[in-house]
Amino acid sequence: MIILVMSMRDVEKIIKGIIKDMNPRFKRKTLRELLSEEKPHVIINGKRHRIKRRELEFLKEIASEDLKIPIVLEVDSSLGGAIKISGKEEVKVISKILGKEIDIFSEKDVMYIYKPELKIVRKELPTTTQLIFKLSLFD
C-alpha cells in the first residue's frame, strides 16, 4: 500500500496545471489583420482555426478594427457562474450583441455575463469567441 501525503498547496498546483492544460493556447489577431486575410484564421493549440468572414463583417460594423480576436470569455470558478469579458472594445461588442447600454465615456473595460447571455453571444459569434477556464481554489 502506498500512502501519498500532499499539502493543499501541492494539490492546488496539480489542479491548476490540469486546468492550464485544458485551456486553449492561442495568439490573438486584430480584426484588421483577419479582414485582410484571404482565409481568416488564428492558431489555437497549434491548429488552424477558421474564422467566418460573416462574423468579421458583422464585427467591422460595430467595433474598431483594433479589436483582438478571438474575444476571450473567461469562466472563473470564483465568480459564481459569471463569465468575465475584459477590454474596452470587447466589452463594447458584447454589450451591443446583448442590447446592453454602455457609457461611452466610461473607462470601464470589464463586464460580466451569465450563461443565458453566453448562449446568445456564442450563437452570434461562434468562431470569433473563445472560452477559457480559471480555477480559484482559495478565494
Curated annotation (Swiss-Prot):
Entry superkingdom: Archaea
InterPro entries found in the cross-reference section: UPF0216
A Pfam family that the UniProt record links to this protein: DUF61
Family: Belongs to the UPF0216 family.
Protein name: UPF0216 protein MJ1224
